[in-house]
From Swiss-Prot:
It is a peripheral membrane protein. NCBIfam families: PS_decarb. This is Phosphatidylserine decarboxylase proenzyme. Catalyzes the formation of phosphatidylethanolamine (PtdEtn) from phosphatidylserine (PtdSer). The modification Pyruvic acid (Ser) is found at S263. It comes from Blochmanniella floridana. Belongs to the phosphatidylserine decarboxylase family. PSD-B subfamily. Prokaryotic type I sub-subfamily. Its main location: membrane. Pathway: Phospholipid metabolism; phosphatidylethanolamine biosynthesis; phosphatidylethanolamine from CDP-diacylglycerol: step 2/2. Its EC number is 4.1.1.65. It catalyses: a 1,2-diacyl-sn-glycero-3-phospho-L-serine + H(+) = a 1,2-diacyl-sn-glycero-3-phosphoethanolamine + CO2. GO terms for cellular component: plasma membrane. GO terms for molecular function: phosphatidylserine decarboxylase activity. Heterodimer of a large membrane-associated beta subunit and a small pyruvoyl-containing alpha subunit.
Length: 298
């Protein structure tokens, strides 16, 4: 019954206005009130501040600052094997597996295809036919930074406007095509394992999506598709972020983007170049740095 009510509210509530107002509230410098809200949030969700670069809550002037708190990557064991790809975010695996031509997965009566998820961009769709994928739901209490599974050079960036339904697994199960219908940021990387898409999916109450190379992508929400192209790298020894010839290069385990509230990250991998870790299963709780897959170097 509760699940049905949650689904109905997704249609009835003015989600965009709620998201806008939540963004304003989270940016408010409320002094002791803000600190109290942050402390309450920490206690409710049992957040481990020792994983943060700055564990002192007095240094966070807004709730957004706390939400975007920098995660200390050194608190995690990163799989440094050059032939492995790592989990890009703290969260829960909501789906994982192989792509059958362009069919990604089915849940209840809803089928997800590359065509819908990638907004009909055939040049990108073709990279991932018969490839593999993983979808990680990031709960509100988790670190909201998304990291690189492997070193990659950014080639294309697409902002696709859309709905702002919740991406909680219960909602995805009951509302058709949420991940395709919601706004999203599609980042296409060229890697040593072939092309990889890292997709940041917007959601209810997500006030902003940002990347490390161009800052805030949304808001404002203009309803327009935006498409950026980036040059190839000319550096044969890519290990760090670089602006060589304007190329955007991010190393494995580097920060890539951030949500200003919990949401979902989707990774797509090219056919026959990436073998997913067989130990990973649906609903597994995963941490940044764990082994996601093994890759074949092109």
């Amino acid at each position: 019954m509760l699940e049905k009510i949650q689904v109905i509210l997704q249609y009835l509530l003015p989600i965009r206005w709620i998201t806008y107002l939540a963004g304003l509230g989270a940016s408010w410098k409320g002094g002791w009130i803000t600190r109290y809200i942050i402390l309450l949030f920490i206690r409710i969700y049992k957040i481990n501040l020792q994983e943060c670069i700055d564990p002192n809550i007095n240094n966070y002037k807004t709730f957004n600052e706390f939400f975007m708190r920098k995660f200390n990557i050194n608190t995690r064991s990163i799989d440094k094997n050059p032939s492995t790809l790592i989990i890009p975010a703290d969260g829960i695996i909501s789906q994982i597996g192989k792509i059958n031509n362009t069919h990604i997965f089915q849940i209840k009566n809803s089928s997800y295809y590359l065509d819908q998820l990638l907004a009909g961009h055939d040049n990108i769709i073709n990279y991932f036919r018969n490839g593999s994928f993983v979808i990680i739901y990031i709960p509100p209490q988790n670190c909201h930074w998304v990291y690189m599974p492997c070193t990659g050079t950014l080639r294309e960036l697409l902002y696709i406007p859309g709905d702002l339904f919740s991406v909680h697994p219960k909602i995805i199960k009951n509302i058709p095509d949420v991940l395709s219908r919601n706004e999203k940021l599609i980042c296409l990387f060229d890697t040593q394992f072939g092309y990889m898409a890292q997709i940041l999916v917007g959601s209810a109450i997500v006030g902003s999506i940002e990347t490390v190379w161009c800052g805030t992508i949304t808001p404002p929400r203009t309803g327009l598709v935006k498409h950026w192209h980036y040059p190839k790298s000319y550096n044969n020894n890519i290990t760090t972020k670089s602006t060589e010839r304007n190329a955007v290069i991010l190393s494995k385990a580097a920060e890539m983007g951030v949500f200003k509230f919990g949401s979902t990250v989707i990774n797509l991998f090219s056919n026959d170049t990436v073998l997913l870790n067989e130990k990973l299963q649906l609903n597994n709780i995963v941490k940044i740095g764990m082994t996601l897959a093994h890759g074949k170097i092109n």
